[in-house]
Swiss-Prot record:
There is a cross-link at G76 (Glycyl lysine isopeptide (Gly-Lys) (interchain with K-? in acceptor proteins)). Transmembrane segments: none annotated. A zinc finger (C4-type) spans 121-144. It comes from Manduca sexta. Ubiquitin is synthesized as a polyubiquitin precursor with exact head to tail repeats, the number of repeats differs between species. In some species there is a final amino-acid after the last repeat. Some ubiquitin genes contain a single copy of ubiquitin fused to a ribosomal protein (either eL40 or eS31). There is a cross-link at K48 (Glycyl lysine isopeptide (Lys-Gly) (interchain with G-Cter in ubiquitin)). Residues 1-76 form the Ubiquitin-like domain. This is Ubiquitin-ribosomal protein eS31 fusion protein. Gene3D superfamilies: 6.20.50.150, Phosphatidylinositol 3-kinase Catalytic Subunit, Chain A, domain 1 (3.10.20.90). The lineage of its organism: Eukaryota, Metazoa, Ecdysozoa, Arthropoda, Hexapoda. Keywords: Cytoplasm, Isopeptide bond, Metal-binding, Nucleus, Ribonucleoprotein, Ribosomal protein, Ubl conjugation, Zinc, Zinc-finger. The record marks H68 as: Essential for function.
Length: 155
């Protein structure tokens, strides 16, 4: 029977084969006509790659069927070069965890009375729980940037 083999260039080769011929035999016939080694050939029929050990009848290849010949590609993707950094990586800032940090804001005297060590911000957007930083001559809120200046007798 006669089958056709279409190459990548669009050229069609005609081969005389039998249904009992193996795919290896077909590849050998293509090598005789085109000079392409069988290990570089891949034959495709009905969207499937044909395996060397099987016959044409296994794939239901009949007379005047068309096989597509593509070349086997060796290797994979291009190997990427490892990046080499010229400056060392910046160390990420780690927040220090202070156990019972609330104890820094209040003081308990011997009578059991609680005294606030820091002043809470009075700004509208701040509210309770936002303490102001103590400077030499003022209190400063880091959130709303309000400042309360001491008078000499206020300290």
């Amino acid at each position: 029977m006669q089958i056709f083999v279409k190459t990548l260039t669009g050229k069609t080769i005609t081969l005389e084969v039998e249904p009992s011929d193996t795919i290896e035999n077909v590849k050998a016939k293509i090598q005789d006509k085109e000079g392409i080694p069988p290990d570089q050939q891949r034959l495709i029929f009905a969207g499937k790659q044909l395996e060397d050990g099987r016959t044409l009848s296994d794939y239901n290849i009949q007379k005047e069927s068309t096989l597509h010949l593509v070349l086997r590609l060796r290797g994979g993707a291009k190997k990427r070069k490892k990046k080499n950094y010229s400056t060392p990586k910046k160390i990420k800032h780690k927040k220090k965890k202070v156990k019972l940090a609330v104890l820094r804001f209040y003081k308990v005297d011997e009578n059991g009375k609680i005294h606030r060590l820091r002043r809470e911000c009075t700004g509208e957007q701040c509210g309770a729980g936002v303490f102001m930083a103590v400077m030499e001559d003022r209190h400063y809120c880091g959130k709303c940037h309000s400042t309360m200046v001491f008078k000499d007798d206020d300290k």
